[in-house]
């Protein structure tokens, strides 16, 4: 059975690119913001990995990361953060909260796939 990845990004084009590169090896679900992600998790869904943009309307990705890492049921799920901002302080802040990786947009989709495979070995 394929491992499940949840993508949180308000840009559908980014989600589609990620899905194209990941769907051959993983079951991919896309939602447009962190609040939808919270609702999806609370409905009983548990992905093996979450890839989340930071800047989204509604619940931002950094707020979602804080929520998930404070929630006993979900804190074990690894989260990769995506950002258009190449900021050392932002990267360090998110890694301290509990992100397993921080990838700057634009990114190479193949590189992201390699990073995902390191986190979710098959």
Residue ranges and their predicted role:
Residues 12-29:
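Two-component/phosphorelay signaling modules centered on CheY-like receiver
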Residues 15, 57-58, 66, 75, ...:
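The feature encodes the CheY-like receiver
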Residues 31-37, 91, 109:
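Conserved Asp/Asn-Gly motif in the active-site loop of CheY-like receiver
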Residues 32-49:
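Acidic, metal-coordinating helix/loop segments flanking the phosphotransfer/catalytic sites
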Residues 53, 83:
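Active-site residues of response regulator receiver
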Residues 107-116:
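C-terminal output helix
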